[in-house]
């Protein structure tokens, strides 16, 4: 079941990469049709996963370590529980609806493929944000969302207002980045770990000691 949910997480990334090749092979209409209908698969997998984890069973999936520096170790891992899978399902439904609406609204736009690819990448980083099992991976998802927000807002880059709005969003996100990084440093300073499972256990222990 964890493997199916892991596939769900990476479907938008596959869409982001493959849509360009699909357009070359079969044309824009077929490429967009395939990408849009992939969200039906995402919703189905999300419903199956939610049914499996609704009993309160936590599922962890670790692909390996990607940062090792002394005691600072960050794993490329995912946690699938009721909360994260519910968020996966909700994001998948909303993103699918946005994809379908965008395809209809921008049907005549020559850059529709590029817009859909940005949407797919945005969805992928949303999935990373809600399923990551540590604060660094959460930060990666947050940064990716900020980048994709800028790309989507400035999509029509010939419009002055679109560029201004994109720049404003980028600046505001950087303020959030600073607060996020400060919190991340403090978490590692006090708990010597950035893994959610370790931090949550130790934080509850500190609370009991304090009381």
Model regions and ranges:
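...captures the hydrophobic TM-helix bundle architecture rather than a specific catalytic motif
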Residues: 1-211
């Amino acid at each position: 079941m964890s493997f199916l949910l892991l596939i769900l997480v990476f479907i938008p990334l596959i869409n982001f990469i493959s849509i360009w090749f699909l357009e070359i092979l079969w044309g824009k209409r077929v490429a967009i049709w395939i990408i849009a209908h992939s969200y039906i698969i995402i919703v189905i997998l999300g419903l199956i996963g939610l049914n499996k984890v609704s009993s309160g069973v936590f599922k962890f999936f670790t692909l390996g370590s990607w940062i090792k520096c002394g005691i600072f170790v960050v794993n490329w891992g995912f946690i699938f529980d009721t909360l994260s899978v519910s968020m996966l399902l909700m994001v998948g439904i909303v993103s699918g609806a946005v994809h379908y609406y965008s395809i209809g609204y921008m049907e005549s736009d020559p850059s529709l493929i590029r817009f859909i690819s940005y949407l797919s990448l945005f969805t992928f980083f949303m999935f990373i944000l809600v399923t990551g099992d540590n604060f660094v991976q959460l930060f990666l998802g947050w940064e990716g969302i900020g980048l994709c927000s800028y790309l989507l807002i400035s999509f029509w880059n010939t419009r002055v207002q679109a560029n201004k709005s994109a720049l404003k969003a980028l600046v505001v996100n950087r303020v959030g980045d600073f607060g996020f990084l400060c919190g991340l440093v403090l978490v590692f300073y006090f708990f010597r770990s950035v893994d959610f499972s370790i931090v949550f256990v130790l934080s509850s222990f500190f609370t009991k000691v304090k009381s």
